[in-house]
């Protein structure tokens, strides 16, 4: 097999877990329309069917990070692919609401695990020059999975075949299981375990030959300086600001409302006045736009930088949601405002998927030292899943109590807050190796802590 072919297969299969996450997230919006035909649903149980995936994801995120730091990225991907298959088939063959909810929890374990692990694996496999571009592949796979789910829902809706909708998630899961044969272990994890020659062999596939020895030297130097355990690193005071930034990124990525659009797009369009068929087309349009803008982000992220994209993204999503809310508040619901809803949500998707959607997945693993990258990324992904769960549970209640216009106004205020967070808190990591980022952040936050201590000592004297 040619070197370039092997390299692209590594990247493709490394990111495939993102497609499964996207599919399992998006498919439930169509399946919910017909589950009630076989399994009676109440308002409560319908909410549980959606949200239990996210509950499972919280635990999956926490477990996969620590496990991948201990046993390696590749072995954990193998386990996750099996859980994906079991969860998808269990959902398809569920006969009671209890079985369906339990199956969604199992599926959520794999969803959360892949959400935490895929960005780490891609960031550690990528050469510095294209790490941002490659890191956005995770989000590209997520939105591609969502689009596939929308298409499958559309195709199977005439047959009311919800079991096929959810069960087809097993197909890419089997593909991931096969693809593990092409996925080597992360070179950084191997260096951490003392397997330098194996790391060099893998980097010969993925890296420019002239950069290999320099990057290996950086990895070895970084590991030589790390005598602490994973838990010890996470407890270190200098890493707390990094964790807070990671947690902030995770919360804002979800709190600006993206998954309410993914989960409830048909409901939003129907509330805004569109018919069933038009709502389905509008939803599919959002799925296509997701993919297009994520590809745009892949082109921009290593040229423009992470921080600038987040800042401009916050401006765009704030204005689009505020404008949408203003139109609905002043003009009410009509045929014209229904299509304006589609347009403004489209603008929102353009800005979100070119910025906050993919950039957060790239930044989270970049922020943390290699000794604790899996565990720290797992923790921030846990927070992301929890924020996703809270927003998805609260959205229907807000929609019922406030109306769609005021709901979008609330999200626009949160988007405005994300601007200040990105501007003042988020560091730029473009063009730096993971070891350079770690050294820079450690110096920045240790220096800040040292300055604070000096001021306190002077005041005491």
UniProtKB/Swiss-Prot annotation:
Q: Which residues lie on this side of the membrane: Cytoplasmic?
A: 1-14, 60-76, 126-139, 185-241, 302-308, 363-378, 424-461
CDD domains cross-referenced by the UniProt entry: MFS_XylE_like
Q: How does it sit in the membrane?
A: Multi-pass membrane protein
In Pfam terms, one family for this protein is Sugar_tr
Question: What are the record keywords, sorted?
Answer: Cell membrane, Membrane, Transmembrane, Transmembrane helix, Transport
Any one of the GO BP annotations: D-glucose transmembrane transport
Task: Please give the start and end residues of each transmembrane region.
Answer: 15-35, 39-59, 77-97, 105-125, 140-160, 164-184, 242-262, 281-301, 309-329, 342-362, 379-399, 403-423
Q: What is its main location?
A: membrane
Q: Which PROSITE patterns match?
A: MFS, SUGAR_TRANSPORT_1, SUGAR_TRANSPORT_2
**GO cellular component: a single term:** plasma membrane
A Gene Ontology molecular function term of the record: D-glucose transmembrane transporter activity
Could you list which ranges are Extracellular topological domains?
36-38, 98-104, 161-163, 263-280, 330-341, 400-402
Recorded hits in Gene3D superfamilies, A to Z, give: MFS general substrate transporter like domains (1.20.1250.20)
Q: Where in the cell is it found?
A: Cell membrane
Looking up PANTHER family in the UniProt record yields: PROTON MYO-INOSITOL COTRANSPORTER
What does the sequence similarity comment in the record state about its family? Belongs to the major facilitator superfamily. Sugar transporter (TC 2.A.1.1) family.
Function as written in the Swiss-Prot or TrEMBL entry: Could serve either a nutritional or an osmotic protection function.
Name of protein: Probable metabolite transport protein CsbC
This chain's source organism reads Bacillus subtilis (strain 168)
What's the source species' lineage?
Answer: Bacteria, Bacillati, Bacillota, Bacilli, Bacillales
